[in-house]
Swiss-Prot record:
The gene is rpmE2. Belongs to the bacterial ribosomal protein bL31 family. Type B subfamily. NCBIfam families: L31, PRK01678.1. Gene3D superfamilies: Ribosomal protein L31. It comes from Salinispora tropica (strain ATCC BAA-916 / DSM 44818 / JCM 13857 / NBRC 105044 / CNB-440). This is Large ribosomal subunit protein bL31B.
Length: 86
């Protein structure tokens, strides 16, 4: 790798405030905010709206949509009512 052209790769804390969940990983992302982690060190923190701790796919709280019912409702609403003159 060429020196001086790549962003710094360092430890960063990602925090999902909605799920009260945070994890420490390595990233090139930057932040002005910091947090003291459980190991006593201070790391940049990036707040996210959704993570594996709050996403319905990963939490098992999925909501299935009745797409067949919606399609049938659409067909009934816009079905042709016989031959149109014109």
């Amino acid at each position: 790798m060429k020196p001086g052209i790549h962003p710094e790769y360092r430890p960063v804390v990602y925090r999902d405030k909605g799920a009260d969940f945070a994890f420490l990983t390595r990233s090139t992302s930057t932040s002005d905010q910091t947090i003291e982690w459980t190991d006593g060190n201070t790391y940049p923190v990036i707040d996210v709206q959704i993570s594996s701790a709050s996403h319905p796919f990963w939490t098992g709280k999925q909501r299935l949509l009745d797409t067949a019912g919606r399609v049938e409702k659409f067909r009934q609403k816009y079905a042709r009512r016989g031959p149109q003159s014109g």
